[in-house]
Amino acid sequence: RGLGDVYKRQINNGDFVRLNFTGKIKENDEIFDTTFEDVAKEAGLFDENKEYKPIPIIVGGNHLLPAIEEAIVGLEAGDSKTIEIDSENAFGPRNKQLIQLIPMKEFKRQGMTPVPGMKITSEGSTGKILTVNGGRVKVDFNHELAGKDLIFDVDVTEIIDNDEDKIKSMIELHYAAPNMDINKTVIDIDGDVVNITLDDVAKFDQKSYMDVTFARFRIAKDIWENMDFEKVNFVDSFEKKQEEDEEEAEE
C-alpha cells in the first residue's frame, strides 16, 4: 500500500483500528470469545451466523472492555499483546443480590418450563437458571464472567486512516448483517455532512425498526465524536431497474 508498508505509527486514543482477539478465563484457560474461526470450533463456540475476522473498534470508544482499549495504546499495526484484566476491571465482582428466587407460577404464566442452564430475560436483564426446586426457580442475573479474572490475546491488524474506511468500519461494527456487502455501501462526504447509502440487503433486513434505528444512531454518534463531521444522513432509495428488452433490441 505504498507508504503504508513502510510508515508505522503508534496507536492513540481515538484511532480506528482492526484487531483479532481471544478471551480466556484466567483460572482455567477456558475460551469464551474469539475472532478466529478455528479457535471457536476447537472451543465449541462456533456460530455459523457469525463472521470470523478482525473487528473494527475506536480506541477509547468503549467498544471493548476499557482495559483492553487502554492496553493497546502505543502498539503498532502488526503488534500482539497478552492483556490480563482482574475481575474489578472486567465485568465486576459477583453480586449476591442479583441471584433471585422466582416463583414457578411466573414461568407457567408465560408458557415456559424452566430447566437449569436456561437463559431468560426479565425486565431487560439476562439471567441463567441455576436450580429448579418445587415451586421456586433460582436465577443468577450476574454477567457470566462476573468475578472472573480474564486474559485477552490481542493482535492489531490495521490502523485505519482513510475517512471513508473509518465510516465503513463503524457500519461493520454496529450494523452486522451477514449478507451485507460493505463494499456496496456508498459513502458521500460533503463538507461536514456524511451521506450513507447502505447495501440493498440492509433495506430488507429482518431487524426490528428499533434495532435498526439504534444501530444507525450508534454509527452516527461514533462519527460525530471521533471525526470532523456534524451530520450523518442515511439514504434509503428505491430505483426502478431498466431491463433490456432483448426482443426489440436491434441485431
Regions found by a protein language model. Give the residues of each.
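A short amphipathic beta-strand at an alpha->beta junction
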Residues: W224-E246
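Short Gly/aromatic-enriched secondary-structure transition segments
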Residues: E30-F46, L98
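Short, non-transmembrane amphipathic alpha-helical segments
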Residues: D205-K231
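Extracytoplasmic beta-sandwich strand-turn segments characteristic of Greek-key/jelly-roll folds
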Residues: E42-N62
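FKBP-type peptidyl-prolyl cis-trans isomerase
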Residues: N13-I31, I68, L75-K108, P114-D161
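Short amphipathic alpha-helix segments
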Residues: D163-N179
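Short, small-residue-biased leader/transition segments that mark boundaries at the very start
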Residues: R1-Y7
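Short edge beta-strands and adjacent turn/loop segments
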Residues: P178-T197
